[in-house]
Amino acid sequence: MINVMGEFLRNGKLLTLMLGHLTVDSYVGVIPVLYPLLIGRFHLSLATVGLVSLAYGGTAAISQPLFGLLADRFGTRLTGLALAWTAVTFSVVGFVDSFPLLLTLALASGLGSGAFHPLGALDVRGLLPTWRRSLGMSIYVTAGTVGVAAGPLIGILLFGAYGVHGTGFLVLPGLVTGGYLLWRMRGRAGAVTAAVRHAGMTTPVPVFALAVVIGVMMSRSWTVNVFQAFTPTWYEQLGYGPAFYGPLATTLVLASAVGTVGCGSLADRYGRRTVILATLVLSVPAILLYTVFPGPWAFATAILIGFLAASTAPLMLLMAQQLMASRAGLASGLVMGLGFVTGAVGVPINGAIADAIGLQKSLMTHAVLVIITIGIAWFLPREDEVERYSAQQEALRTSPEQV
């Protein structure tokens, strides 16, 4: 693990991509802290306020396969521009006076996030050594998780001091990091040749294996998004203040960061399928403990949920990239995009359930979802199968991945 982290620190491009991932995902972490302010300002229900996450996450999700295709064809030199766009559009959210306009800005901001994620993941895959790709991708993904974790704390500080207009300050990190990322990645390769594109498009894809990977990713994203989105609102309903639910939301996400790195290391040793199944099984009691026993004990159970629920996303991302090695940009867009859209759609769905039966019971339903997902995950491809598919396509890897 130390050797792989050292590789990130020595490689300026990897380090800059980590910084960009941290920054773009910090905006995701701010959204749940905005919920209480938006509910009061626009007189929204829980289901309606969840549309903000749907607008942001849905646009990011739907657009990712398209941006992945563009990355396979034209390269990834403009990754920093996507980050800057996200920063500018998100920073204006606190200054609009109508909910439809706010949703429009959330859509625009999500478009920038949708561009950044497949481009960044494709860059990182090409820069990492093959022998520790699971851990390396996990470290990169962890940077985004740390950004999500920092988001609630940043939001609490800014909104506590400036109200909803505090979003204006959020333009600064995105513009600075986006500009630096553009400069660092200026030497990346451009468009691929027509012959390579044609070879990649005609290579057969293991559809069933890819569908299973995407299905597990979608389920995990739903659970992660819902718990991160509604923890602040649930605890406000229970009578707790921002000083309690802000750190609790951050604990939930930081635990995800630790779990991501830990599971990446374990996957390199024991295999990704084994690690994914183990985390799914352990997630069921973790969800029940978190929802049945709210209060100060939630900091301990939040660590369990965070560690288990979000930790396997980079493993599934790498699986998809290897299953579609000659179209890794599209693979990144598909697995992350469909995962994003499920998480985004899941927030208003659970919000509607919460309006009917309460937030606590709404969150508890995810124990059932995880049990169903265990059955799906049983059909995940084994390491030798993934490597075989990857080897068949590795010679057709596109030039955007070359350094």
Language model: regions and residue ranges:
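Extracytoplasmic gate region of multi-pass secondary transporters
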Residues: 31-32, 209-253, 257
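Central cavity-lining transmembrane alpha-helices of secondary-active solute carriers
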Residues: 54-67, 250-262
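Conserved MFS/SLC helix-loop-helix module at the cytosolic interface between two early adjacent transmembrane helices
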Residues: 62-97
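Helix-to-loop junctions at the C-terminal end of transmembrane segments
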Residues: 63-75, 260-271, 354-355
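Cytoplasmic helix-loop-helix junction between adjacent transmembrane helices
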Residues: 105-143
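Helix-loop-helix hairpin linking two adjacent transmembrane segments in secondary transporters
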Residues: 139-186
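C-terminal transmembrane helical hairpin of 12-TM major facilitator-type secondary transporters
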Residues: 273-316
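A late C-terminal transmembrane helix in Major Facilitator Superfamily
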Residues: 326-356
